[in-house]
Amino acid sequence: MRRKHDWLRETYRKSLEKIPERPVAHRTLSNIAPDPLYTPEDIGVLDPEYEEKRGFPGEFPYTRGVYGSMYRSKLWTMRMFAGFGTAEQTNERFKKLLKAGQTGLSVAFDLPTLMGYDSDHPLSKGEVGKCGVAVSSLADMEILFEGINLEEVTTSMTINSPANAIWAMYLAVAKKKGYDWKKLGGTIQNDILKEFIAQKEFIFPPEPSVKLVIDTFEWGPKNVPKWNFISVSGYHIREAGSTAAQELA
């Protein structure tokens, strides 16, 4: 049975070698300096099944976190959902947020973009740039990220039906600017089943829509390995009337 001191000597030490602890005082409101880890061992209980049931931070099954030192080393990425009007306007907003200390970007697209329509399509009238940024072309995507280092920030894009096309535009912009795809980090929502059940922003029938999602799963890890190819959105399904069990499923 592995003990707490084993984890500190092995996993935690290796984690700190990669990302040292943040230069702040890790103390509670009662001015207590907490240990990097607490287990049943701290109250005198040696549970032989603990490692299998809960595990340790940075180790399978990752119940206690995917990194050994977790937020002692690096806080979670903080990104405000942002996007409105034109690509120029949203680019200006992105730069303002990054200057203020934001550590990632989260792109809000307008309804025509979410539905796969160009801004000049008749059905787009009155909706262009209203609830997010309008992106109809590669040129729009270039403007959207002009002056932003795509290897230094991660980008989350709340896009589903046209996710593969929008992501392709993003990667094309990165390639044109000379960035290495293997260093790019980010997320595409890409949860098309949520669209059919809840949000209703779908373009194609379920079967070909799911096939497009699968295509990103197959191609992505080989070419953009640090990217998250789906963000499952159970929240929307619950808001549309599902039970908690259906949301989880």
Enumerate the language-model features and the residues they cover.
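Catalytic alpha/beta active-site cores
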Residues: 1-249
